[in-house]
Amino acid sequence: MIEFGDFYRLIAKGPLSPWLDTLPAQLSAWQRESLHGKFKTWFNAVEHLPQLTPTTLDLHSGVRAEMSPPISAGQREGMENMLRALMPWRKGPFSLYGLDIDTEWRSDWKWQRVLPHISPLAGRTILDVGCGSGYHLWRMIGEGAHLAVGIDPMQLFLCQFEAIRKLLGGDQRAHVLPLGIEQLPELAAFDAVFSMGVLYHRRSPLDHLYQLKNQLVTDGELVLETLVVEGDSQQVLVPGDRYAQMRNVYFIPSAPALKAWLEKCGFVDVRIADMAVTTTEEQRRTDWMTSESLAEFLDPHDHSKTVEGYPAPLRAVLIARKP
């Protein structure tokens, strides 16, 4: 089973130490009571991966690991088989010892849109809410972060993260915990909090913004990336049964409305940093994620609309500060 002892020891003497009052019992209960029916299969794949330590590791321009001399073709094939047992791979890409994991999302493109607008991450302790496979955690480490903590209740993503970590030499600067934001105490201990691709899945978006705020230190920075619609500060889309085939989409505000929400929740220095239409080059079906993707979620005759007739996905990045 996945052990979290390294993380507990890591935070024991720092600002996250109060978390130890609740976290170990919480994760022990998760291991006993909440494991997915496929978890053992997924974790078995992780255990059968080789423990590799790269001679070249690039987390600045991507997530890339190489070894000299290179691993054998047989080792690479065995590694690929174990990683394919963890499909679908949604967030990436990863390049590992000559094997490229071509994920559904080009998460590196999102990072390129976000990075120019945020405060330097060097030396910072960071929380990434809804972190998926942990791709962006590694990019945060590549920018010099002291510690990057991701939370995501999806257990496949936890196994994907642990697989990548094992192939990166067991790097302890990034960690993923199988939790939702609502399961965290009000730590007020992170220098930066990222919430990317989460807000529209929340039934109560303002509660989510308060939860994010409660994790930040004073003067800490929130990086919020989410779906938006065009319009003024009063414009909010509340989809019906589905949006782009997703059932769990509740509120899609305009960027000005989202700015107003953040200000209502007490954030300051709120700015709309970026807006970008999601394309079928950024989100698409691949050999590592073979089910339907964005192309199937858009109107086949008019890609400016979803199949339900709503505006096609438009994503905004907002930056805000906790006073």
From Swiss-Prot:
Molecular function in Gene Ontology: methyltransferase activity; transferase activity, transferring alkyl or aryl (other than methyl) groups
Short name of any one Pfam family annotated for the protein: Methyltransf_9
Domain of life of the source: Bacteria
Catalytic activity reported: carboxy-S-adenosyl-L-methionine + 5-hydroxyuridine(34) in tRNA = 5-carboxymethoxyuridine(34) in tRNA + S-adenosyl-L-homocysteine + H(+)
Keywords: Transferase, tRNA processing
Catalytic EC class: transferase
UniProt keyword Coiled coil present: no
PANTHER family named among the record's database cross-references: METHYLTRANSFERASE, TRNA U34 CARBOXYMETHYLTRANSFERASE
Function: Catalyzes carboxymethyl transfer from carboxy-S-adenosyl-L-methionine (Cx-SAM) to 5-hydroxyuridine (ho5U) to form 5-carboxymethoxyuridine (cmo5U) at position 34 in tRNAs.
Family that this chain belongs to: Belongs to the class I-like SAM-binding methyltransferase superfamily. CmoB family.
Subunit-structure text: Homotetramer.
Family annotation (NCBIfam families): PRK15068.1 (NF011650), tRNA 5-methoxyuridine(34)/uridine 5-oxyacetic acid(34) synthase CmoB (TIGR00452)
Name under which the protein is recorded: tRNA U34 carboxymethyltransferase
Species whose genome carries this gene: Yersinia pseudotuberculosis serotype O:1b (strain IP 31758)
